[in-house]
Each structure stands twice: as C-alpha cells, then as structure tokens.
Amino acid sequence: MTKKKTFIPLLYLTSIVFLPWCISFTFKKSLESWFIDWWNTRQSEIFLNDIKEKSILKKFIEFEELFFLDDMLKECPETHLQNLRTGIYKETIQLIKTHNEDRMNTILHFSTNIICFFILSGYSILGNQELVLINSLVREFIYNLSDTIKAFSILLLTDLCIGFHSTHGWELVIGFVYKDFGFAQNDQIISGLVSTFPVILDTILKYWIFRYLNRVSPSLVVIYHSMND
C-alpha cells in the first residue's frame, strides 16, 4: 500500500513533466510544414513591410556600401555588374526568409506554450486527488527534517535565487523563457526583469518568514538568522 501511495504521485509528476512537452512537440512538428506554406502564400506583403520597418537602418548601410562598390566597378564589364545585382537580390531574399522563419517560430512557440498551459491546467483540475497526495507527502518529508536542515535548505535556496551572485543565473533563466516563447532577445527587457524579479522574491520571502515561520516554528527562524549572520 505504501509503495502504491508513493508510485502514483511519482507517475503523476512524470506525466506532468513529459506529457505536455511531447504533445506540444508533436503539435508543432505536425503543423510546421502546413503553417510555413500558408504563411509564404498569404503573408508575403505583410512580411516585406515588416522587414523594411525592422531592418531599414541596417540595410541602408549595407546597400550604401554595395552602391559604393558598384560605382567603383563601373568601368568593369557588364557581366560583373550583373553578378553584383544578382548577389544583392539573393541577399535580400535570404534576409526575407530569415525574418520569415523567425516570425513563424515565434507564433509556433507561443502556440505550443499555450497548449502546455491548458494541459497543465487540465491536469491540476482532473488530478486533484494526486495533488493532495503529493502535498501530504511533501509536508510529511519536510516535517521530519530537523530545524537546522530546514534553515540550511532555506538559506541555500535563497542564496541561489536571490543572492548577490544569482544575477547570471536569472539572466540564463529569463533568457531561456523569453526564447522559449519565440521572442527575439531584448537585453533591456531581460536586464529590467533581472534587476526587479529577485527583489520581489526577496520581499515575499521576508514576509513569509515574518508571518508564517515566526508563528509555526520560532526556533527555525532563530537558527535561520544565526546561520544567515
């Protein structure tokens, strides 16, 4: 009975971790080719406008350099100039394809994450008994720990998440989540989140220690502050 009681939560947690990912991955792969064909045939005009808006300054500089080169080659045979124009055209088409793929990946990533969210929401609603069982097992495990180990665990977790050396870790995590949703990397947004999110977590943790731990286990709070000092 004890093994069954432990096996069911483990199976439930495993399915939560892997099943949404498998379903979203299958959904993405099955619709990717169809979506690419649809986008290429229906959204070309929107795409070209978007390219001009996003890359106009960069492409002006690049084309200016190419025009200077064109002026230098005016004395060259016509075939050389034709090759130059062909190269410019190919580079422009490649730029359009690159932005096309980025835009499609953004939409596909966002769609698959929405699917994962609905799957996890359904799991939390339909698997209410399993969640209660997992909660009881976690509470029992934490209750059996000594106050010293509890304080050490809290201190280790807080130093990893909101310590002065956790900035690089938050940059990696937020950058990964940002990329997973298909958005282009924006250093200003990531820097803003890194500078504010740990502060919010630190405030929540201090409030939790003050309101909850002081009432439940004052000795744990004393040990925690002693180790923190």
UniProtKB/Swiss-Prot annotation:
It is a multi-pass membrane protein. This is Potassium/proton antiporter CemA. GO terms for cellular component: chloroplast inner membrane. Pfam families: CemA. The chain crosses the membrane at residues 7-27, 107-127, 154-174, 189-209. It catalyses: K(+)(in) + H(+)(out) = K(+)(out) + H(+)(in). The gene is cemA. GO terms for biological process: potassium ion transport. The keyword Cell inner membrane does not apply. One of its GO terms (molecular function) is antiporter activity. It is found in: Plastid, Chloroplast inner membrane. The keyword Ribonucleoprotein does not apply. Belongs to the CemA family. It comes from Glycine max (Soybean). Contributes to K(+)/H(+) antiport activity by supporting proton efflux to control proton extrusion and homeostasis in chloroplasts in a light-dependent manner to modulate photosynthesis. Prevents excessive induction of non-photochemical quenching (NPQ) under continuous-light conditions. Indirectly promotes efficient inorganic carbon uptake into chloroplasts. Keywords: Antiport, Chloroplast, Hydrogen ion transport, Ion transport, Membrane, Plastid, Plastid inner membrane, Potassium, Potassium transport, Transmembrane, Transmembrane helix, Transport.
